[in-house]
Amino acid sequence: MATKFATGSSKGDNSFEVGKNAAQQAMEGLSGAEPSLALVFCSSVYDYDEVVKGVRSLTKDTVLVGSSSAGAFTEKGVAPKSVVVGLISTDTYKVHAGIGTGLRESPAKAVEEALKGIPTTIEGYPHISAIILQDGLAGKGEETSLMTAATFGQEAHLFGGAAGDELEFKATTVICNDKCLEDAVSICVIHSKRPLLGGVKHGHKA
């Protein structure tokens, strides 16, 4: 099975329906393939818990990570004050995720909590990548990355970023499966048969 990636975006007044609509668009883009990972980026104007419920009404128990945002985009363009969902379907990845709290006080403990129970190696999937999404107001980006790298080694590829809140700088939230928390870090670990590649910047104009 080839790896497929599809996106959807939606906005509106009902947080559950907005999440569901964005997920529905992404599901249609997979053309019937089952999702292996859901990525959700949600404007702070929405109720995060309701958005996640809407997404998971379609993706079910698929591993889900995400965060609040200060603007999002898909390949179709910029999507301000919206919910954006990306779905990956693949048989060449093994995906796990966890969330750790108390990031401000102890990044080490938060990362340890997030990674608890996640295997460091999986036979047949030699490459390791991690998507690190953290409370953008905690100010612990460097520490969080270093702690994750220390767990998986120098060969691990690290991606991710900090949660936003439409530039209000009041509260930022990260998401892991059905949990939406502040002062936390959400980490998705991907073991893959081939290395994952990262990109910097995008093709959209301001």
Show the residue positions of the predicted features.
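Cofactor- and metal-binding active-site motifs of prokaryotic enzymes
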Residues: 1-206
